[in-house]
Design a protein with these regions (language model features):
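Short connector loops at secondary-structure junctions
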Residues: 133-151
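Short helix-loop capping/hinge segments that flank enzyme active sites or metal/cofactor-binding pockets
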Residues: 98-105, 157-228, 283-293, 342-344
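Short glycine/serine-rich loop segments
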Residues: 1-78, 276-288, 292-297
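Active-site-proximal beta-strand/loop segments in catalytic clefts of secreted hydrolases
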Residues: 22-26, 45, 81, 107-110, ...
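Sec-exported extracytoplasmic/periplasmic mature domains
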Residues: 14, 79-83, 126-133, 157, ...
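Loop/turn elements at helix/coil->beta-strand transitions in domains of secreted/extracellular proteins
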Residues: 16-20, 70, 101-102, 131-134, ...
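A short helix-breaking turn/cap at a secondary-structure junction
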Residues: 40-124, 131, 142-145, 189, ...
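Glycine-rich, small-residue loops and helix-cap segments
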Residues: 1, 201-347
Length: 347
């Protein structure tokens, strides 16, 4: 199922076309397609995995991450993908008893209004209790900055132009578009193909920004990083004295509508905070709703990647909710959806 720029990786891992796949995330593109396709998705701390040869969007948020059928598979991929001189053995760090004695912060403000997702989430929380964890209720969203949405978007516009220009300039001479401006011009020249379904208004907005020395960019970047780090995840972990944060990973995936646009349901989850902070986040399948998968998220502090993987592993060993793939020609062939379209209720 599509959800974000790594949808192909999610579908490939879910359908067993590969034991694992690499996704790339700026804000949700590892977690969202993993949630939608019923696989494990791990978004590492930004900087832990090399971004070389990956088309960039944001220097503060971009990261590659594994999308696999199990947490063990994600840990194995991280052993190969992680960089740095003091490399961690992520497989050896997995502990199926990781939840015992831990204080877990439950992000109640991010649960959304879908009763089926919330029911699965409550069942998953009971699993944590049975595993020996203590739950701590967190009801207030720590991000209170009124300009947060605009600031975070501005940061992406500035960083997209700067990072893409550098990336395009370093490509082989056979690549004819050497900058964002030239990409925009190419799309206009080939509008019948490149702009048949979508415009490039975001490209245009990025192109008119200045450089990363602009005080407007610096102020916006510092504000959103502070809101998601010191006043966000770091504050929640410290003030509530918890080891890790949990939430539903996201909604069930909507149908794709290239004409009118996809219609997303009320969006549970808190992945944007971890994405913008650049902190680790894992989603593990917690069940299905009308044949559609949904995941359970663990989020931690900067560089707590091994711990976050291990929390996910402990949860997975107790639940094993990943659904084996079934193959249909289109979504309307799914039993629940087919019955609904016929006006019938499936037994």
């Amino acid at each position: 199922y599509p959800c974000g720029s790594s949808s192909g990786s999610g579908a490939g891992a879910a359908s067993s076309m590969a034991a694992g796949a690499v996704g790339t995330e700026t804000n949700g593109s590892v977690i969202c397609p993993s949630n939608a396709n019923g696989v494990v998705g791990f978004k590492p701390t930004v900087g832990l995995v090399s971004q070389q040869y990956i088309v960039p969007i944001s220097s503060t948020q971009d990261t590659a991450g594994p999308m696999t059928k199990s947490v063990m598979g994600a840990a194995m991929m991280m052993n190969a993908m992680a960089t740095g001189s003091a490399k961690t053995n992520y497989v050896a760090a997995l502990d199926q008893d990781m939840l015992r004695g831990k204080r877990v912060g439950v992000l109640r403000y991010s649960t959304g209004s879908n009763k089926d997702i919330n029911a699965l989430f409550e069942e998953s929380l009971n699993v944590l209790i049975q595993a020996g964890a203590e739950l701590v209720e967190i009801t207030e969203n720590p991000i209170q900055l009124s300009e947060f949405g605009q600031y975070s978007f501005d940061v992406l516009l500035y960083e997209f132009k700067a990072t893409l220009n550098a990336y395009q300039a370093a490509t082989p001479d056979t690549v004819k578009t050497r900058s964002l401006a030239e990409v925009i011009a190419f799309n206009i020249e080939n509008a019948g193909i490149e702009l048949a379904l979508f415009d490039q208004s975001i490209f245009d907005a990025a192109e008119i920004t200045s450089n990363l020395d602009d005080p407007r960019y610096i102020a916006a970047r510092d504000a959103v990083l502070k809101a998601t780090r010191e006043e966000g995840i770091d504050k929640l972990l410290a003030e509530h004295n918890v080891d890790v944060l949990v939430a539903p990973s996201g909604p069930t995936v909507p149908r794709v509508d290239p004409i009118n646009g996809d219609v997303w349901p009320p969006f549970p989850g808190s992945g944007s905070m971890a994405a913008i902070a650049g902190y680790p986040h894992i989603t593990v399948p917690m069940g299905t709703i009308h044949s559609l998968s949904v995941g359970f998220s663990f989020m931690g502090a900067k560089d707590d990647d091994a711990k976050v993987l291990s929390y996910g592993y402990a949860f997975e060993q107790l639940t094993n909710e990943r659904a084996e793939p079934q193959y249909y020609t289109n979504a309307e062939d799914l039993p629940d959806i087919a019955a609904a379209m016929r006006g019938q209720k499936r037994n």
